[in-house]
Structure formats: C-alpha cells, structure tokens
Curated annotation (Swiss-Prot):
It comes from the Bacteria. Disulfide bonds: none annotated. Residues 14-91 form the GIY-YIG domain. The keyword Ribosomal protein does not apply. Residues 196-231 form the UVR domain. This is UvrABC system protein C. The gene is uvrC. Interacts with UvrB in an incision complex. It is found in: Cytoplasm. It comes from Geobacillus kaustophilus (strain HTA426). Coiled coil: none annotated. One of its GO terms (biological process) is SOS response. The keyword DNA damage applies. Belongs to the UvrC family.
C-alpha cells in the first residue's frame, strides 16, 4: 500500500456513504456502499481476502468517497454510481435494472404496480426503494388495505382477489370515480408519510390478535409494520420528479474554500464535482464568482434548476445564470444542500490534514538530509543542471527549494556564453561563477546547500570556483544517476564520496524531487532555446525577413513545423506582406 492510501485511510469518517476504488490510471474499478466508510474501506487493506477481492485490492491505487445521511441513501447512490462508471469489479448491479417504484396507474380503474421504469404517462410514482423485498411487501400490504383493480384487462367475471377482499371487481360491479379517487388519495397519503397512522392501526390489530391467541395473524401484522419501516426510509439523494438540477454546497476555513456540486438528472444523483481553491474574498461573493466560471466551461451545461444555500444572493445568481434558482428553507432540497456542504467541509478537513502531514514530513526530510551530510538543516537548497545536444545551444538552470518546497519565483535560466562544444564541467563552472558573483554583489542570501546534477568531476569543478575564485565555504553535494537516468547516489565531501541513504526514506524522495525538477526546468529551457535557433536559422536567407518579422512569425506560429504547415494566407496573418509570405512558403517547401 502506498503512502497516499495510508494517509487517506487515516482520515475516513465513521459515517455512511459510497466509496469509489480507482486503479493507477484513475479509472473507477469498483463502487461500494458502507454503514461506516472508515470501517468498510479500511477492511480492504487489512487481513486476508478471497481471490477475487485480493485481485481488486492489488489494483487499488486511490479512492474517493461521498458521505450520505443514511444507509438507504447510500444504496441508491451506489446504484447510480455503478451505472455511470460501469466498474469492472461490480457484477451484481451491472445490468440495466433499476430499483423498484410503486406506481398508481392513470387508468379509469387504477391499478397498483411495481415497476422499474418511470414514464411520463400520468401515473403516480413513489420511490425508488432501496430494499426490493420491502417494496414488494408494501405493495402487498397496500393491496390488502386498498382494494384497487388487479387485472391488466377486465375479465368477464370476478377473480380470486375479489373473493379475498382485495379488489372491488369493477369487471362485474359498478365502482364510481369517487371510490377510486378516495382510495388513490389514501394510498398517496400513505406513501407520502401518512403511513404512521396505518402503523398505529396495525399495531392495535396486532395486540388484539395476540390477546385472542391469533398468533399467525399477529405475526402478519408485525411483518407488515416491519416492511413499512424498511420501505419508508427517506432518501435525500432522490427527488421524485424529472427536473434536472445542480445542488451546490460549500465550506470554508483557513483561507480555503471547497464547493461541492451534486448533479441530479431525472431526479437521481448521478455525479458530483469537488473544487478546492484559495479564498480571496467573502465566501458568498466567491461562490457567485465560482458559479459564473463553473457554467462557463463547455462540459457544464446549465440544468433547469440550480439549488443554492440560502446565504447566497439569489437574485444575482438568477441574473448571472439565466435559469431557475432555488434556495430551500426546508424539505429534501434543503437537506441536499446541507449534505453537499457537509461533504465540502469533510474535503477541506482532509486537505488540511494532508497539508500538515506534508509540511511535517518535508521539514523532517530537510533535517535528516542535513544530518546525513553533517551540516545544519539546509533550509535553502540551490540546484544546478546543464542541458545541450552535442554541445549545441548549451544552457543551464537553477532551481531553489525553501524548507523542502520549490520556490519557483527564484528559479533562474542561463545561456552559456564562454564554453564551446559539449564541456559539462566548464559549463557548470561558468554558471556557478555567474550565479554567486551576483549573489555576493547584490547581497542576496547564500544557500545552505548547493546540489549539482552530476558526479565527482562536476563537484571538483564547482568547488574550485566557490573556494578558490569566490572565497565561499558553502556545503556542496552531487546527485548521480543510474543507467535508467534515475537518482541513484548522493555524493559529498572532499574528495567526494557516496553518502549512504535509504532509497525509501523521505530525504531520498526530497533529493529525487529536486533532481527531477532542475532537470525538467533545464530541458524545457533548452527546448525553447533550440526552437528559436532553428526558427531563426530557417528564415535567415529570405529577403524581406528581418528580426522584427522573425519575432512576429515566432510569436504567431511557435515552431518551424507549424509555420511549414501554414498556407500563404495563414502566413500573412502574422502581419507579413503577401510577397514576403510567398517567399517564406517557397523556402520552407524546397
């Protein structure tokens, strides 16, 4: 298990929710739900597992989670996340089934059905329900309590349901619209929360049956009450309408802000977006700025409705977005806003934890590096690297790390002036001389440690400049690479010798980061320098193309390749006269 996973496991909340396991490519490979995210997710990385689970665990490189308010809510969310991501390790919910809804049809003699598809057909839908068995039991209960028609087509004679008292038999007996309407209203009231009254009635009947020793009947009432309790759990993640809406929640602390967006489509939560950024103004103002930028992105289409916390200026938001903006004060929408805000607060807390851990770890790495080298903790480290191709366009780069973190404003680039050909030692001598001559002249801070990307020869050349030319006594170290161009050894001392380091230690990782960063910076600078050289040399012999037009062409096209792909008309767009553009085109296509 990598360090990142260990750290994320340490801050998991003991709350219900869903978790998404990801592989090294960031692909979601498994979605699960949990009563306690902390206990469930940790269980994957402790103890032994069967073959299938072990294969899953071996592929996990990262994970994320969404906190919910109940287990039922987590189950519904899990279903939607699985449908969205289609993870390869999820098998049970990979088909196109949905959890069931209870439906009252819009027919003249309405029926009560269990369906997995919601249509705009005038029917009344309730759900989806997180427990299939409970939904079926509730439907059976409603059938017994409210004797609506059962048959899909009216038969010529009364069926068994009529004789069981579960159907009024409109096939043979007149049933008025008022009777049907009254039953539908009672069912709607039941499913919308009036079930508590029914539970009380059933409880009374259960006690009466028990007193008269009708234990089977009492057991049936008890099971019906349990089924109601299982089914009627409220799911804040679901809204029983077809409106597409985005729900926003936010939290802020310590100069940072997190905004979480729940995307509800067709009444279902299908995705969420998490953004964490520095807070530069009042949170409510920052939220409005965020809204404008959020929907400016092409892949964020505006829904029919945006749901916002009540402390945001709703009128400004409506004017900004041009869609319906809702700021609920109660009900499911308010609970969704609160849930989004709760997840935002958790994400911020997690970020601060990692920041503190990273800072603590980085400082310790700096201190341990100093111990290994026998010097005080090198709070300021300056590192050099050269870059050239067979001596052409030689450059060098300097990066600065303060307390183990890159200080990019202090990075410097150097074009080599006095060295001809591929001479790495002399290049390093020139650049170090130029750097610290200026440092001394301008009274800039000296580093606590200088790191050279190179071996013993590089160290000897640099030490000669520092001590014999500039009179400086600054700790010096070299980083050697192996045949795969990876950090392999730390060299220090006079004469230079290998400093033993654990390759898994934080100080070794710090040196790797420094070496990778200075190499990246040097190579990027060399690439740009070489590109300019090639660009200018290609244009040198073309009449009418001076330095000003070379610069204009470089700024417009960026490379010889793109300029070569351009037509004469496109060349003219760089403020080049047509006659000159034709000459450039001919030269590039000789």
């Amino acid at each position: 298990m990598n360090e990142r996973l260990k750290e994320k496991l340490a801050v998991l909340p003991e709350q219900p929710g869903c978790y998404l396991m990801k592989d090294k490519h960031g692909t979601v490979i498994y979605v699960g739900k949990a009563k306690s995210l902390k206990a469930r997710v940790r269980s994957y990385f402790t103890g032994t597992h069967d073959g299938k689970t072990q294969r899953l665990v071996e592929e996990i490189a990262d994970f994320e989670y969404i906190v919910t308010s109940s287990n039922a809510e987590a189950l519904i969310l899990e279903m939607n996340l699985i449908k969205k991501h289609d993870p390869k390790y999820n098998v049970m919910l990979k088909d196109d089934k949905s959890y069931p809804f209870i439906k009252i049809t819009a027919e003249k003699h309405p029926r009560l059905l269990i369906t997995r598809k919601v249509k705009k057909d005038g029917g009344k839908y309730f759900g989806p329900y997180p427990n299939v068995q409970a939904a079926n039991e509730t439907k059976k209960l409603l059938d017994r309590l409210y004797p609506l028609r059962k048959c899909s087509t009216l038969p010529s004679r009364a069926c068994l349901y009529y004789h069981m008292g579960q159907c009024l038999a409109p096939c043979v007996h007149p049933v008025s619209d008022e009777q049907n309407k009254a039953m539908v209203e009672q069912i709607v009231r039941f499913l919308n929360g009036g079930y508590e009254d029914v539970k009380r009635e059933l409880a009374e009947k259960m006690h009466e049956a028990a007193e008269t020793l009708e234990f089977e009947r009492a057991k049936e009432y008890r099971d019906q009450i349990a089924a109601i309790e299982m089914t009627m759990e409220k799911q804040k993640m679901m809204l029983n309408d077809f409106i597409d809406r985005d729900v926003f929640g936010y939290a802020y602390d310590k100069g940072w802000m997190c905004v979480q967006v729940f995307f509800l489509r067709q009444g279902k939560l299908i995705e969420r977006d998490v953004s964490i950024f520095p807070l530069y103004q009042d949170p409510d103002e920052e939220m409005l700025t965020f809204l404008g930028q959020f929907y400016a992105k092409a892949h964020h289409l505006k829904p029919k409705e945006v749901v916002l916390p009540s402390d945001i200026d709703g009128e400004l938001a409506r004017e900004l977005l041009g869609v319906a903006v809702v700021q609920p004060k109660k009900g499911k929408k308010k609970e969704l806003v609160e849930l989004a805000s709760k997840n935002a607060a958790i994400a911020l807390k997690e970020k601060f934890y990692f920041i503190e851990r990273d800072e603590e770890r980085t400082i310790k790495a700096v201190e341990r590096l100093g111990e290994r080298l026998g010097i005080p903790a090198p709070r300021r480290i300056e590192a050099f690297d050269n870059s050239n191709i067979y001596g052409a366009d030689p450059v060098s780069a300097l990066v600065v790390f303060l307390d183990g973190k890159p200080a990019k404003k202090e990075y410097r680039k150097y074009k080599v002036k006095t060295v001809a050909g591929p001479n790495d030692y002399e290049t390093m001598r020139e650049v170090v001389r130029r750097r610290y001559t200026r440092v001394l002249k301008e009274g800039l801070p000296l580093p606590d440690l200088i790191i050279i990307d190179g071996g013993k020869g590089h160290l000897s050349a640099v030490r000669d400049v520092l001590e014999n030319e500039l009179g400086l006594d600054v700790p010096l170290a070299g980083l050697a690479k192996d045949e795969k161009h990876r950090t392999s050894e730390l060299l220090a001392g006079d004469p230079p010798d290998v400093v033993p380091l654990d390759r898994q230690s934080q100080e070794f990782y710090l040196l790797q980061r420094i070496q990778d960063e200075v190499h990246r910076f040097a190579v990027m600078f060399h690439r740009k320098t070489r590109q300019k050289t090639m660009f200018h040399s290609v244009l040198d012999d073309i009449p009418g193309v001076g330095e000003k037009r070379k610069k204009a062409l470089l700024n417009y096209f960026g490379s010889v390749k793109k300029m070569k792909e351009a037509t004469v008309e496109e060349l003219q767009r760089a403020n080049i006269p047509r006659a000159v553009a034709e000459k450039i085109y001919e030269k590039l296509h000789e």
